[in-house]
Structures are given as C-alpha cells and as structure tokens.
Amino acid sequence: MNFENLLIELGTEELPPKSLRKLAESFLANFTEELTKADLAFSSAVWYAAPRRLAIKVTELALAQADKVVEKRGPAVSSAFDAEGKPTKAAEGWARGNGITVEQAERLVTDKGEWLVHNAKVEGVETKSLIAAMAQRALDKLPIPKPMRWGNNKTQFIRPVHTATMLLGSELIEGELLGIKSARTVRGHRFMGLKQFELAHADHYLADLKEKGKVIADYESRKALIKADAEKAAAKIGGTADIEDSLLEEVASLVEWPVVLTASFEEKFLAVPSEALVYTMKGDQKYFPVFDDAGKLLPNFIFVTNIESKDPAQIISGNEKVVRPRLADAEFFFNTDKKHTLESRLPSLETVLFQQQLGTLKDKVNRISALAAFIAEQTGANAVDAARAGLLSKTDLMTNMVMEFTDTQGTMGMHYARLDGETEAVAVAMEEQYKPKFSGDTVPSAGVSCAVALADKLDTLVGIFGIGQAPKGAADPFALRRAAIGVLRIIVENKLPLDLVTLIAKAQELHGTNLSNANAAEEVLEFLMARFRAWYQDKGIGVDVILAVLARRPTRPADFDSRINAVSHFRSLEASSALAAANKRVSNILAKVEGALPTTINASLLTEAAEQALAAKLNELQPQLAPLFANADYQQALTLLAGLRESVDQFFEDVMVMADDEALKNNRLALLNNLREQFLHVADISLLQ
C-alpha cells in the first residue's frame, strides 16, 4: 500500500485568540475520526494554528482504502430452489442484483440452516476523492457558538474564510471547503514577507510559511519562543517575568511572528499595590510583569508584538503611552480609596442587593460575621477577629479600585485593612475569603481566614437552597458547586473538627425568616455529600470506596476523609477481597432476619470450633479497636480487622448459621452482627468491588 503526507489549511480573518487552541484541536480530532471511519490508515496527525489560519497535517496517509470482501447473504437454500431443483424468482433476483448467476453463488452453512452467499470484492476508494468531504464534515462539527456570514456567501464560520489548501504530497486535492475552492495559494504575514505564495508540497508548509511568509504556524513552537525570549528579556534587567500559562496561550494566539520587547513605567506607580498594577498589565494589555528576586514588582513589563520593526523604540514608546493612563487610574483610585476606612463603607452595603429574598450585602456580612465567630470558637481561632473580618468582608466591593478592576476584590480589601490598622488576621482573611477560587487553587490555612471563607460559602449555600433555587442541570448562577467543594476542601485540608449538620443549622438560624424551603438543611447536606463523591472521583478514588464510606453518612468532612484513606488502604491488603465478600454475605443473611437483630453472644452456645475461634478473635480485638475508633485511626483499625480473614473464612466453611435450633441460630446471628458492626465503625466494606 502506498502512502503520502496530507496538508489541509484554512486561511481566515483573525480568529478569537481564546478559542484558537480548541478550534485546532477539535478540527484535528474530527478529521482523524473521519479517517478512522473511512478505514484510511495513517501514521500520525498534528494540528497547526495561528491568528489567521487553522491547519492539520497527516503523516503517511494511505492513498486508497484497502480492498475488502463483503459477504452478501441471499435466500436460504430451502427457498432458493423449487421442488424440481430450479432457482426460484427470489434467488434469481438476488443473484442478478449481485451480478452473478445462481449457479455461481456459494453456500454458507450455519446452525440455522444453509444459505446462498456471494463474497463480493469491493475495491477501496482513492483517498483524494474522499478528503474534501471529510474535511468539510470535520469543520462542520467545530465548537462554534456564534457563526457568522460574510459577503453574499451563505456559508457560516467563526470568521470569514479566504483560502483553502488541500495537498496530498505534491498533488492538489480538488474540492471546496466552506465555499472556497482548494488551491495552492497560502497567505503570509499581513505586513512582512510575501502576502501570498504557492505551496508545492505538503511537507513544505511550515518551512515555506516561515521563510517566505514570515509566519510561525506551529502554535507550540510560537508559544515556546515567546516564553524563552520573555525569560531572557527579564533576566537582562535583573528580574523574572510572570508568565502565566493562560496569558501565554492568549498572546501566542494573537501573533504570527512574535517579537518580544521590554518597556518601563514610572517608579511612582509602585506605591500602588502590585496586584492592581499586575491586573492592568496582564488583563487589559496582555503584558508580562517583571519581579525581582524578592518578589517585588519592577517598573518594567514585557510585551509581544507581531512585527519586526526597524524602529522598535517607537513601538516600545507606544506601549508605554498606552499603559500609563491605566496605571494612573489605579494610582488615583488607590489614593482616593485610602481617604475612607473599610468600616466607614459599611452603610453603603445597604444599597447593594445580594438577593431579593436574602437581603442586602449588609445583611449578608452581618450573617457572615456571626457564623465566622461561631466557626472560630469551634476551631480555636480568634473569634473576635473572625467576626470583624466577616463584618468587613464585602466592604472593598464599594471602593473605586475594585469597581474598576473587579478581579482585585479581596486583595484590595487586604491592603486597605492594613492601612486602616486592622489586625493582620483580619487583613489576610479579607483576601482569603474567596479561596479556593478555581480547581487546583490553594485553600486558606489561617484560622480566621478559614472561618470567614466557610461562613461566606455556607451562608450562600443555605440561603439559595432555602429559597428553592438549587442548581438545576448545568445552570449554577450562584456557583454553589464551587462553594460546596470549597467548604469540603477547607475543612478536610485543614483537618478542622467541624460537623456539616451543625454548620448548616447555624447558617439556617442566622437567615431567620428569610427561608421558605423547609427542607433546606437536608438538601444542602445531600448536595455537599454529592460533592464529596465528585471530588474524590476527580482525585482517582474508586466509586466503590466512596460509596462504602457514604453508606455510613459521616457528616464531619475531616472524618470522612480519614475513612476514605483508610478504606483505600484496606483495598490494597491481601485480605480485603475475601473480607468484602464475607461482609456482603453477612449483610445478606442479616437482611433476611425479621424483627430486631440479636446482639448478645452466649459463649456456652458456641458449639463449633470455627465459631469459637471467630468469637475469641473478636473478643481479643475489641479492646484494641475501641481507642482506634475513638481517635478516628480508621486505617489501623481496618488493618487489625483484616487479621480476621482466616477466622471468617473458616466460619463460613464449617458453620451453618441458620441452624434448626433457634438459640444456636440467634447466637450465630449475634456473632455475625457483632462482626459487621466492627467494620461499620469505618465503612460498609460489603460495597467494595
């Protein structure tokens, strides 16, 4: 079979930078799926993307589908011939349709009878005749929320399309993509190199674009180049560039020929909290801030331009002029905000509605303050600081800085709290109340911060559930799923001795008569339990392990986590499978018992050696297990219980539990009930698979 390399490129107007990678990856995935469906073999496939193009290259693509034999079954032999042995009309019609005579048909014998059959050879179709349609289907399936039309064309795409190129080796594939006829013409950079040129071979794509068109089409190469050059530029001025991957991705999606330059701003702006300056540089201007070895912001930034200029100083000056007014705004807002304390902003919270039925932001901070103090008292944190931080927690939302630069909420609250002379614990809590902000973010670790963060999230959870607006489907306007995961992570990762039932009840109490849903507390608890399952599944914990712990319904998250870890460890023990099966058997036996389960074991009724041995082993372990359960040392407890395997196996081998003698039967049921209860102190291991 012959092979050749395939290139497909779509030349467009500037594509949305935040969607570029996803579009390219989806194009490749969709097209390779088409190749697989068409039974076209290939070695590998990659995607390329730049602001004005999407491309894929397939290596060693088969030039044709493989020939194959298709079995075409006809009528049963019993109905294919009449009494005289002549072909019936049905048989002749089938044969004629397959281009053969009945005599040329083969016979197929199955367990259901004998059939006429024709093994037809189907020649594979040439790849070049399939490419255009497959590429179009791949493009049609791209994730484009708002397609657009251009000119008089009825075709829709994310941006107007100007060129389409499909090359199989050096051969141009005929056809159209999005209404554009395939041609060798490829467009270069807007302002450098050749505006357009013809591509002779699929393998020349990257090199020709780079040399002739001044375009680096390989997205990953462009990204790596920007990162390396930015790091070098920062090092030259004695600093380190803050190169966040999401920003790097966006910048790489904005340029075809990246040129990294360094600029500066007046040192006076460094008096403004660095977070506000960084937000301006990264969020608004797509610049990379530079920090010294001590982590202090330098009066410099690194930016990426899309052109090699004969006068880079002019480009640098232009970018400095652009960023200066934004930094001046931040400076003005900061200086203006400092004139008023956070406490003085409390009355203004009464003008902002949190939720129609749940009151204003002032109502919310009052609840947060009380709940944070309650939590702090249980965890040993400073309750006075927790109450104060809760009260001030939303006041920075009323500052000019946060109104202009919304992502600085909390952070600016921390800075303003320090300027107001609040305690450091209160100041830090102002920032950490929102943690974790996203998956993988850190959680607060300081006691006061934990109390405020938990109070804020629980107040929202209980309040929204309390007015009957729980998340439905994918809709979650109040980000309750994130809040729930945040509650669990904060408690678990800080090993806080908190019970969800108690916390929910207190939050519900603080809402007073606001809540109309009588089942709110139970619904919030169920919601949090469901988040437990999702969180642990994301961490790679087996569903059966999670269900085994959920069966015991522990409502203390730190305790829940200890049980998960213990059961996960138990599964690694050699005895776990046998004991899980035994517990399942025990559960099934006990489930059939009518009325209350017997609990008292009468030693004199233990007549079999195996039941005597099991009872003795349990009696030996129970004094050791009691303190382990009390101290939540579940892993050690299950490790000890794993030692029961041989005794349990022997019991089921030798002992008839459901004996005819009622006293013996009840005694054995009591023994099994006692055995199961030891494991149930941790989890229902009968659910382990």
UniProtKB/Swiss-Prot annotation:
Parts of the chain that traverse the membrane: none
InterPro entries found in the cross-reference section: DALR_anticod-bd (IPR008909), Gly-tRNA-synth_bsu (IPR015944), Gly-tRNA-synth_heterodimer (IPR006194)
Name of a matching Pfam family: DALR_1
Chief location category: cytoplasm
GO molecular function (one): ATP binding
Top-rank EC class of the record's enzyme: ligase
Any single biological process term in GO: arginyl-tRNA aminoacylation
Keywords from the named record: Aminoacyl-tRNA synthetase, ATP-binding, Cytoplasm, Ligase, Nucleotide-binding, Protein biosynthesis
EC number: 6.1.1.14
Assigned GO CC terms: cytosol
UniProt keyword Cell membrane present: no
Catalytic activity: tRNA(Gly) + glycine + ATP = glycyl-tRNA(Gly) + AMP + diphosphate
Compartment list: Cytoplasm
Alphabetical list of HAMAP family matching this protein: Gly_tRNA_synth_beta
Family: Belongs to the class-II aminoacyl-tRNA synthetase family.
Assembly and oligomerization: Tetramer of two alpha and two beta subunits.
Protein name, UniProt field: Glycine--tRNA ligase beta subunit
